[in-house]
């Protein structure tokens, strides 16, 4: 369970978030919507540890994680999927899924993650994660890597971008 208590954040003298309170129970799918510039991405970056709030508290399963950085939060089971997936020259799709899972997965297991996001695994498993892939293909591969991580909480920034 994730809980935010009175989260505030400012940048360049402008208040972006003010007294945000939110509770997300386990096994829930939550969507936060709003116009451009309303603070959605900022909130996701604060939860993931990329940004630090000016004030407030972030609790994960009752533990205060406010002072923890992105690496420590990732170890506790929080993952973040960026609006623009990263491309990796020289890294295959299978390599990326294995890295995400923390295991040396069989090709069949890695392919299963691709199949779950609607991709024909045999067409992608050995391809490099580079500029030859479209934005939509990269996004699906990124979602497959998120699934391979098996985290407690996954934050998607503009998942349909």
Regions found by a protein language model. Name each.
Residues 146-147:
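ABC ATPase C-loop
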Residues 33-35:
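The feature captures the beta-strand-to-loop junction immediately N-terminal to the Walker
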Residues 2, 17-19:
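Conserved structural motif at the start of ABC-family nucleotide-binding domains
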Residues 84, 90-109:
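Q-loop/switch helix immediately C-terminal to the Walker
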Residues 64-79:
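ABC ATPase NBD coupling module
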Residues 48:
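Helix-to-loop junction immediately C-terminal to a conserved catalytic motif
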Residues 143:
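Hydrophobic anchor residue at the start of the ABC signature
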Residues 154-158:
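Catalytic Walker B motif of ABC-type/P-loop ATPase nucleotide-binding domains
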């Amino acid at each position: 369970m994730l809980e935010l208590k009175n989260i505030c954040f400012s940048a360049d003298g402008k208040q972006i978030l003010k007294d945000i309170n939110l509770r997300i129970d386990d096994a829930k799918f939550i969507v936060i919507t709003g116009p451009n510039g309303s603070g959605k991405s900022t909130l996701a970056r604060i939860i993931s540890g990329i940004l630090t709030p000016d004030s407030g508290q972030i609790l994960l399963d009752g533990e205060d994680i406010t002072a923890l950085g992105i690496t420590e939060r990732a170890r506790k089971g929080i993952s973040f999927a960026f609006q623009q997936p990263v491309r990796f020259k020289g890294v295959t799709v299978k390599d990326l899924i294995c890295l995400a899972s923390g295991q040396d997965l069989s090709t069949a297991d890695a392919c299963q993650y691709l199949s779950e996001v609607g991709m024909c695994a045999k067409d992608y498993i050995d391809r490099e994660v580079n500029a030859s892939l479209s934005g939509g293909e990269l996004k699906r591969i990124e979602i497959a890597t998120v699934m391979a991580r098996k985290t407690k909480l996954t934050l998607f920034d503009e998942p349909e971008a």
